């Protein structure tokens, strides 16, 4: 039986929506969850829901790591925080994975400190799904864990991202590219050019350099895009901001006339489908690849759907033994 630890205390809006998502995962997906946080508060919220009590446990954690806390200090001094407690019950194999919508740096630091790295992994990256016009999402690796990278880090990111795309998104032969300032082989900086030479020697479906427009299905077809965490995090936040801006502009435009409002009513099912396709909550969170346990990091604003989706991904990663695949391929490719 696979259990997933859920940090219910660290989100922006309190524990109720996170607990709702966890209960939905139990009721709709058959998941088993350990809710990590203040036991009394969790118990009171659970009274609002119906669920199989054999599939929900509570792990008491009296402390909370704030978004403004120093990650490296917090994970050592706040040992009874929900982030640290969730990590530790993955480390002791009580749970196969964890999800936290809290301080990203603290979640990463806790995972590195208590779970450690998979043998052979140089630097664990964050793998973030980017919704596409059609089909499964594109995977952005690294989306913020490592702001400074060496070429061999990027080569490992390519391998880990390819495995994730195969196992979780069911893409048979994922196309892998390096994010660059042009698609020509000689475009890029010193690190990306050296990484290009390393990755093209690997037995993966490498399509070379890709440009920013390729991330959204408007150019070269690509499933995994590799970059350092500095660029990746900017891309991720810009993508999220642009998506919200487009829908806000559309909403305001509809308000301008009765004709537009009538048209919007006719298009409501289509607009709803588009919004669902572009909603990050459909994918739950970003996986911290390369740590010796499944660790998903969510938005502070994660809603119930995002939590449910993250729990589903955690279980799928464990079922597919993604970490064993990563260790085996890195060893086989000698990188």
Curated annotation (Swiss-Prot):
Per its record, the protein catalyses: a fatty acyl-[ACP] + phosphate = an acyl phosphate + holo-[ACP]
Question: What lineage does UniProt assign to this protein's organism?
Answer: Bacteria, Pseudomonadati, Spirochaetota, Spirochaetia, Leptospirales
Please, one GO biological process term? phospholipid biosynthetic process
Protein name (Swiss-Prot/TrEMBL) = Phosphate acyltransferase
According to the record's subunit comment, the protein's assembly and interactions are: Homodimer. Probably interacts with PlsY.
Q: Which InterPro entries match?
A: FA_synthesis, Phospholipid_synth_PlsX-like
State one molecular function term (GO): phosphate:acyl-[acyl carrier protein] acyltransferase activity
Instruction: Please name the gene that encodes this protein.
Output: plsX
Q: Which domain of life is it from?
A: Bacteria
Where the protein is mainly located, per its record? cytoplasm
Checking HAMAP family in the record gives: PlsX
Q: Which Pfam families match?
A: FA_synthesis
Q: Which organism is it from?
A: Leptospira interrogans serogroup Icterohaemorrhagiae serovar Lai (strain 56601)
Look up the EC number in the record and give it: 2.3.1.274
Q: Which family does it belong to?
A: Belongs to the PlsX family.
